[in-house]
Design a protein with these regions (language model features):
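A structural-propensity feature for long, helix-poor, extended segments
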Residues: 41-84
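Protein-protein interaction/assembly regions in multi-subunit complexes
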Residues: 25, 67-70, 75-76, 84-86, ...
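Conserved phosphate/anionic-ligand binding catalytic regions in large, soluble enzymes, centered on
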Residues: 8-26
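A conserved regulatory-domain signal marking ACT and ACT-like small-molecule sensing domains
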Residues: 91, 119-228
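Short, hydrophobic/aliphatic alpha-helical segments
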Residues: 1-10, 40-43
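Short glycine/threonine-rich loop-to-helix capping motif typified by GTGT followed
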Residues: 51-59, 101-103, 186-194
Length: 228
């Protein structure tokens, strides 16, 4: 057991699940979008829906979408800061069958018109699980440098991506593969030990059959490089 698991994260309260985890869900969604969102539909499920307002979950998710970290003292003011930043958001509730009680579904549109749907759960102690991206099941927590590759489900893409990582001395900690249907749309999620350089993202983005590439460097918390 890690010390973090006992003490929990440094955060603005009141709850690690409803506040710190919610900030991280919003922040990860922003990073996956690859740019500042201009509109956000925020849908709360389960415990988030029942007690989220009293625990500040709504403000925490908006704070994350603005790029704040869980210990940011501005989290309680995120609604007014969103207005200043030009972020138009709505907050509602949803019933998600089989989802964790602390789950949020975020539908985002970025300043360039790019769209993204992310489902994330706060699983305790400020930890999160990103369980869907654009309707495709995923399973990662944002605790590593993470490479997310969207591609056509055709042979060779896994080898291309892993070769590009190996050529740069980047070790893969975990790798998960998901697809909509055989020959359809696929997503790779690779958690890595080393940071993901710009050159890697650029190279992968230029490969035939690869639709979108996102690199999340967790050492920098908010750094992201994304291309479509």
């Amino acid at each position: 057991m890690r010390l973090f698991d006992v003490l929990g994260p440094v955060m603005t309260g009141p709850s690690s699940s409803h506040t710190a985890g919610a900030v991280r869900i919003g922040l990860t969604a922003r990073n996956l979008l690859g740019e500042a969102p201009k509109t956000a539909e925020i849908l709360l499920h389960g415990s988030f829906a029942a007690t989220g307002r009293g625990h500040g979950t709504d403000r925490a998710l908006v704070a994350g979408l603005l790029g704040m970290l869980p210990d940011d003292e501005r989290i309680p003011d995120s609604f007014s800061l969103a207005q200043q930043a030009g972020l138009d958001y709505t907050i509602g509730t949803v019933v998600l069958r089989g989802a964790h009680p602390n789950t949020a579904l975020l539908r985002l549109e970025g300043v360039s018109g790019r769209k993204l749907e992310v489902m994330g759960a706060s699983i305790g102690g400020g930890r999160i699980n990103i369980c869907q991206i654009d309707g495709i099941t995923t399973n990662f927590g944002g605790d590593h440098n993470t490479l997310i590759v969207h591609n056509q489900d055709t042979p060779g893409h896994v080898a291309e991506v892993t070769t590009a990582l190996a050529q740069r001395g980047i070790n893969i900690a975990t790798m998960q593969l998901y697809r909509s249907t055989a020959g359809g749309y696929a997503v790779m999620v690779l958690e890595c030990d080393q940071p993901l350089p710009d050159a890697l993202i650029t190279e992968l983005r230029g490969m035939q059959g690869i639709v979108k590439v996102t690199g999340l460097n967790l050492a920098q918390q908010t750094e992201t490089k994304e291309g479509a």
